[in-house]
From Swiss-Prot:
InterPro entries membership: A-crystallin/Hsp20_dom, Alpha-crystallin/sHSP_animal, HSP20-like_chaperone
Entry protein name: Stress-induced protein 1
Organism field: Caenorhabditis elegans
Gene Ontology cellular component annotations, sorted alphabetically: cytoplasm; cytosol; nucleus
Entry's Gene Ontology molecular function annotations: unfolded protein binding
A Pfam family assignment: HSP20
Family note: Belongs to the small heat shock protein (HSP20) family.
Biological-process GO terms, alphabetical: determination of adult lifespan; embryo development ending in birth or egg hatching; protein metabolic process; protein refolding; response to heat
sHSP domain location: 33-141
Length: 159
């Protein structure tokens, strides 16, 4: 007896439409392959040295008036909000980045600048005070303390 629906080697029904579209998805110049051109990647660079703490961000997709930089305690928050409305619709874009500043940053002298390429740089000089580090014993469940080899007791720029 022959089958009314011969086996074709691929599923039938619901998934057939998706399989028929597969050649279009695989095209080299499809919209999905150009996604990085549509939504730019933000550059995020953090530098923490003995002299300063520095954050660099690519904010070229935002106007300066669409950006906010706030400092609450030692938490630095950078926000951007962009909105475009036309008769055909609207688009919104936003981001938020937070950084916890080291304890030895001079909070009164933080400087923010945006260059003509849209790169935001936030420089926070450090006060130069050293942080003392002391080794703590590690206790095992048996009650023994493991002592560490002594190391330098003063560090700068390590957090």
């Amino acid at each position: 007896m022959s089958s009314l629906c011969p086996y074709t080697g691929r599923p039938t029904g619901l998934f057939r439409d998706f399989e028929d579209m597969m050649p279009y998805w695989a095209q080299r110049h499809s919209m999905l392959n150009n996604f990085n051109n549509i939504v730019p990647q933000q550059l995020n660079e953090v530098e923490n040295t003995a002299q300063k703490f520095c954050v660099k961000l690519d904010v070229a997709a935002f106007k300066p008036e669409e950006l906010k930089v706030n400092l609450e305690g030692h938490v630095l928050t950078i926000e951007g909000h962009h909105e475009v409305k036309t008769e055909h619709g609207f688009s919104k874009r936003s981001f938020t980045r937070q950084f916890t500043l080291p304890k030895d940053v001079d909070l009164a002298h933080i400087h923010t600048v945006i260059n003509k390429e849209g790169q935001m740089t936030i420089d926070a000089p450090k006060t130069g005070s050293n942080t003392t580090v002391r080794a703590l014993p590690i206790h095992t469940s048996a009650g023994h303390a493991v002592t560490q080899k002594p190391s330098s007791t003063t560090t700068t720029g390590k957090h």
